[in-house]
Structures are given as C-alpha cells and as structure tokens.
C-alpha cells in the first residue's frame, strides 16, 4: 500500500463500473498471458532506468518451475502499487521445494501510476480468477498467496473455491489503520490524487513499484478490504494458512488481523508469524510465533509492511541492494542524506528518531526461518 501525508478516505459497497485505460490481456494460458502483459508494459511504462529489459522482467508475471514433477502450484498476487517483484525471493523458495509458482500483474500496475485512475476491483479479481483456474487445470493441488491487497483478493477467491488447498498471507490488508479510507470512493472523481503528482518532491515510482497512487487505487483497496471482512464474517476458514505481520505496520490494523487469525483461521496447522513485542495472545496460542523486530546490530528500528517478503540477499532490496527507499515520511533533509548514500537505519513509513535517518526496511533478517515455517504449513 502507498502512503500519503493527506488522509486517505471512503466506503461505498457497490463496485465502480469504470473501464481501465489499458487493454487487458485476454484469458489464455500463462505463457501467452505473460507475453501479452510484457507487451502492455512495454507500450505504456514510464521507464525509470536505462535497462528497459530488466524493468520489463521485474514488473512482468513470472514463473518458477521445480526440478521434476510439481507436487503442487502456488499463485502469488502483489499489493497496491507493487509488482510481481514482491515475490522474487518467495517464488524461488517455493520452487526449490517442488512447487510450480506463478505471479500476476494486477491491472493498472507496472506501467505508470496514472494508469490506476480508472481501474476496478473487478478487473483485479478477473486476473486472479483466470490465472488460478489456469493453474488448477495443470496441477492437482493449488495454494494461493497474496501481499496486502493481494491477500484480500486471494482470500475472496479461496472462499468461493473449495478446491484451493490453503493460503499464504503476507501483511494481509483486512482492515486499514486509517479511519478515513472509507471516503476514497466518494472523492476519487473530484480529487483524483491525494498527493499531487509530479510535485518535484515526492517520487512517482521506482523500477518496481509506485510511490504515489491515485485516489481510485485507495478506493479499490478499500473495496477489497470490505470484501475480505465480509468473507471472514461469513464463516471460519478451515484450510491451512500461513500469515505474517509486523506489530508496527503503518498500513494495517494489526490487532484486527491477529484477532482474525485466532478466531477465523481454524486449522490446527496454521501459523501466524508476528514481528514485534510478543502479543498477549501468543502464550495461549501456540500457532502464533513471535520474533523481536528491534535489531540495533542491523540498524533496524522496526519491521515494515513490505520488508517481510524479501531475503537480505535480494539484489534490489537487500542491505546492499540498488533500490533504497528514502521516501519514508521523514524531513526532506534526512531524505536527502539517505539519497546521498549516507549510513541509515531502517523502519516502516513515518518512524522518526532524533539523530537517525531511516530508510524503509525492505528485507527480512528472519527470511530463512520464516520460509521454513511457511513450508511446514504447506506440508499439512
């Protein structure tokens, strides 16, 4: 999810019927879908580096195949403003354990933020529906995974399709921590942007994600959250679920997510990884595994919404990676120091501490341990 200095806002439960500005690839096999999406990106993207080929591949749907016959499949869905790069590491980890893994690109993403002005939740759902069905035709057992908004989308699909074997939910955006997100559907037509685009201060995008999103993007995020909560209220979800959240997430109502896990995700083999101070529920619930998220030896003040996904070895987002996110809710002089390559600490959006410059935490020091917990859940 993208942050704004201005409050994000709104709730109407009917979906907008707007058409996307971009032509969507038709329903096809995955290889054709990927090639058509690559062409769409190439035609519409505002490239951020001189290496257009790399940017195309980073933003396009990906597939990882295991050695030998796959024992199952996993479809992974990114979040608002993100791209398939979100699963660069997790995809490889799962494929190494025998799964065929695929990612999708949600409409409006991977090109330029303006292309989200008219996108709809229904279009996002269509991509998930088509590619989940395609994967189900190819392997006997399919799991779905999602990050943030993507977690809402796969939860919705799983509630409608009992053949889905389980879920992997990374920072699931069941409920925002903003009291105003419900307003965004009402104001998107009069205020297309919550943060003015191209203001000379706030970057619009990086090679792999947007840093500014139209109001309509937040509106569709809101709709997906409402839908996820409706599904959870419908009935408990009884398949194995792996979930991971951080206490200091600047996007989510993490207490609501924790309570949802304890009350609605009932499989005894499900696990929730919680980064932060051990929640009160953890001692009573062996399914909740807590780890400290203050790691001063690594200059980590707190974990972030997005950092849970990435290995420290990630070539873009690791501590030695090429994509340091300095737009992190701090004063402009601190942002300039970060961009100049000075030593930094890491945090989620908006955290400040005297005498320290904070970049966004974009890697997870517990990645290997977290992956083993995830794989154990898949083995249920």
Regions found by a protein language model. Name each.
Residues 146-150, 154:
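Gly/Ala-rich beta-loop-alpha elbow adjacent to hydrolase catalytic centers
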Residues 16-17:
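C-terminal motif of bacterial Sec signal peptides marking the signal peptidase cleavage site
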Residues 105-110, 173:
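Short beta-to-alpha linker loops that shape the active-site pocket of alpha/beta-hydrolase fold enzymes
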Residues 169-179:
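Active-site nucleophile loop of the alpha/beta-hydrolase fold
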Residues 111-138, 143:
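Catalytic nucleophile-loop/oxyanion-hole region of alpha/beta-hydrolase
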Residues 56-106:
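Short, surface-exposed "cap/lid" segments of acyl-processing enzymes
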Residues 63-67, 212-354, 359-379:
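Serine-hydrolase catalytic core
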């Amino acid at each position: 999810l993208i942050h704004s200095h201005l409050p994000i806002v709104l709730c109407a439960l009917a979906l907008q019927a707007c058409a996307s500005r971009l032509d969507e690839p038709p329903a096809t096999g995955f290889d054709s879908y990927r090639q058509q999406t690559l062409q769409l990106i190439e035609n519409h993207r505002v490239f951020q580096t001189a290496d257009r080929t790399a940017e195309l591949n980073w933003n396009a749907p990906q597939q990882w195949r295991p050695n030998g016959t796959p024992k199952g499949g996993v479809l992974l869905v990114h979040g608002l403003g993100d791209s398939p790069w979100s699963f660069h590491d997790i995809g490889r980890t799962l494929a190494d354990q025998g799964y065929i893994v695929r990612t999708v690109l949600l409409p409006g993403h991977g090109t330029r933020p303006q292309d989200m002005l008219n996108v709809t939740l229904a279009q996002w759902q269509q991509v998930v529906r088509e590619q989940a069905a395609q994967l189900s035709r190819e392997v006997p057992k399919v799991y779905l995974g999602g990050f943030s908004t993507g977690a809402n989308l796969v939860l919705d699909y799983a509630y409608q399709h009992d053949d889905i074997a389980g879920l992997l939910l990374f920072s699931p955006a069941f409920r925002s921590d903003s009291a105003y997100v419900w307003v965004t559907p009402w104001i998107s037509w009069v205020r297309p942007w919550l943060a003015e685009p191209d203001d000379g201060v706030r970057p619009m995008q990086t090679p792999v994600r947007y840093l500014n999103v139209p109001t309509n993007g937040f509106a569709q995020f809101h709709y997906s959250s409402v839908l996820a909560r409706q599904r959870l209220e419908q009935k408990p979800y009884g398949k194995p679920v792996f979930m991971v959240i951080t206490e200091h997430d600047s996007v989510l109502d993490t207490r609501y997510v924790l309570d949802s896990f304890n009350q609605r995700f009932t499989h005894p083999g499900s696990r929730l990884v919680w980064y932060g101070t051990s929640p009160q529920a953890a001692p009573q619930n062996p399914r909740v595994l807590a780890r400290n998220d203050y790691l001063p030896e690594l200059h980590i003040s707190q974990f972030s919404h997005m950092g849970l996904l990435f290995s420290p070895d990630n070539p873009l987002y690791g501590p030695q990676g090429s994509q340091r996110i300095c737009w992190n809710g701090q004063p402009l002089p601190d942002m300039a120091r970060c961009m100049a390559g000075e030593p930094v600490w890491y945090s989620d959006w908006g955290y400040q501490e005297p005498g320290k410059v904070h970049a966004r935490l974009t890697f997870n020091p517990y990645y290997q341990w977290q992956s083993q917990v995830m794989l154990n859940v898949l083995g249920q």
